[in-house]
């Protein structure tokens, strides 16, 4: 869900309502259950095939197709989720916990038969992109396919009525306005940065503070990226970081694709980084745990996410470049 919505908080509130109570029932601590949901939801924006709106903005900045951005993101995203899965697995082993009884597990074939058709809009979007059409056209095709898709099965056909269609259009318009306003405000900030020369000054400041040492510059950039992204949607946070932070990394010899992916990661990870960890706060509303316990657990579970950007800067082959 997170890879489609492009919002860690929205993902937490949607899927967390089911997953967090289930994890608590299986024996996981409240803080751990909430942090798992927050970290997993945050990673949705780095996992192809959709990756939210920010990946499309990156494609525009780099002047490449969205599919290349998805290719760059694939291996790092897999590492992120493998590390998260192993952390959860070892936590379960440590506390001698077991999964659901086989009788409680739904059959995959039954689920696919009843709900598998709901993947069609996503398949259409990906297929349209693979055929070389633009991202807006792919999104339009995906939206247009939702109603015919829902009509394919009786279980989803009952939800198709004028009230629900109008409600969906209303929610879509609200989400569009939120993203558009955020990007517009970020655009104003970027305009000021270029007019005043602040971007160049910031680049020189990072280079001077790091004394031209790449690793130190990356550490400073990661801290700045998290600070700029705190409490902000990923898209405007990424746009501002592109103007302020990417030029400094490129000057130090980082390839431009890796530099963009680096700031992209830290714009996203601000959602699980205290003190303004919005995804953790959202999960905490469901888990009812201590916010600091949840934040520390999220930092521990998401630690790989903070390391991976350094890995692909020093080893760009991880991005399949």
Where are these regions (language model features)?
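Membrane-interfacial loop-to-helix junctions in multi-pass transporters
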Residues: 26-32, 113-119, 173-179, 205-222, ...
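Membrane-interface helix termini and inter-helical loops of multi-pass transporters
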Residues: 62, 193-209, 316-321
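Hydrophobic transmembrane alpha-helices that form the pore/transport pathway of multi-pass ion
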Residues: 1-44, 54, 234-266, 278-293, ...
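Alpha-helical transmembrane segments of multipass membrane proteins
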Residues: 42, 53, 57-61, 122-130, ...
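Membrane-embedded alpha-helical segments of transport systems
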Residues: 1, 33-55, 71-87, 265-273, ...
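Long, contiguous bundles of hydrophobic transmembrane helices that form the permeation core
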Residues: 71-175, 278-321
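Helix-coil boundary and interhelical linker segments in multi-pass alpha-helical membrane proteins
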Residues: 59-75, 247-258
